[in-house]
Amino acid sequence: MKLKINSQGLKGHLKVPGDKSISHRSIMFGSIAKGKTIIHDILRGEDVLSTIEAFRALGVEIEDDGQVITVHGQGISKLKEPEKALDMGNSGTSTRLLSGILAGLPFETTLFGDDSLSKRPMDRVATPLQMMGAEIVGQTDKVKLPMTIKGSAHLKAIDYVLPVASAQVKSAVIFAALQAEGLTKVVEKEKTRSHTEEMLVQFGGEIKVSDKTSLVPGGQKLMGQEVTVPGDISSAAFWLVAGLVVENSELILENVGINETRTGILEVIQAMGGQLEILEQDEVAKAATLKVKASQLKGTEISGDLIPRLIDELPIIALLATQAEGKTIIRDAAELKVKETDRIAVVADALNSMGANIEPTDDGMIIQGGTKLHAPENAINTLGDHRIGMMVAIAALLVENGEIELERAEAIQTSYPSFFDDLEKLSENL
């Protein structure tokens, strides 16, 4: 598709789609809890639909009336062996978290996905689940999809130190621990997003969290709840950056989730001198209205324990850095290589083709800022990565003339089906 270029500014209010991480987990907890779970403002993107279809295949009744989703949970022990292999689409979250649930169920399930998901390593989740007693077989020593899980009704609790900072692996172990005999201990090296722990408590479960250590007793019973999903800060990130770098822009984003394990991008914007206001903060819902204006920005360093708090936002942060004066260094982010694409290489290639000056490194990027972007000579392919597609669409707004062709733009449906509609709306408000 041809992208809109040469924006004269973006103006207006926007409510971004529901948080993808919370949407996945609300379906999962609703499916393993007993009783009715009602979910408001869920993200209806392709990844979350993969989770919904997987639990329907496991025997859970899930209704969608277009307004709310209702999950009729009967408890985890009532999940049934699916009649065929489960299609995870492009969703790493669906695959890894569901693996933790399947690990404790006494039947065999095969999971498969698209080409991108089939390249992603699942050994990181298979290893602790095998230690607990599940049998898991996948492709190559990295346990890639298709992967078959033979669960055990007698999982054993473990003490496990996560080798990588991964909320998905942590969550898989927590889901398995709910079904295990004994007390499971999970230790993180870097703190990652905490939605699983918080939602477990919301559904009546027990977990003790102290800094980077979580203790989960086994044999827990959960009860259905009512959940309202806040806006996704990872989706809001594209508009935050657009509002900062496109001249004559001023944007207000309503009801954005600001869980402290996800707000790294807000700290980066402030460190770079961006005009950002946090308004109407709801401490209970962990949501706020965010306002940004076009700003003069300066380079910064992004590393260490900040990385897990903005890992999904790093592609659009790279674009932000191209428009800041001076150098921005991103390090400790090797995890980017095993996302939907190798995001270090793909981000650098895409933005460099538009005139940016980005040097990819083993664990991040060195970005020389203050560069003027131009139309690339060739089309840019998302390679099936939704965040690459949206990053390029925002970058295109900075290009004064020429044409930018985005191939496989449909990947954006994964997390933000209304992205181009929202872009049009904000462009028309001038």
Curated annotation (Swiss-Prot):
It is found in: Cytoplasm. It is an enzyme of class 2 (transferase). 3-phosphoshikimate binds at residues 20-21, 25, 166, 168, 312, 339. The active site is at 312 (proton acceptor). InterPro entries: Enolpyruvate_Tfrase_dom, Enolpyruvate_Tfrase_sf, EPSP_synthase, EPSP_synthase_CS, RNA3'P_cycl/enolpyr_Trfase_a/b. Keywords: Amino-acid biosynthesis, Aromatic amino acid biosynthesis, Cytoplasm, Transferase. Pathway: Metabolic intermediate biosynthesis; chorismate biosynthesis; chorismate from D-erythrose 4-phosphate and phosphoenolpyruvate: step 6/7. The keyword Ribonucleoprotein does not apply. NCBIfam families: aroA. Belongs to the EPSP synthase family. This is 3-phosphoshikimate 1-carboxyvinyltransferase. It comes from Lactococcus lactis subsp. cremoris (strain SK11).
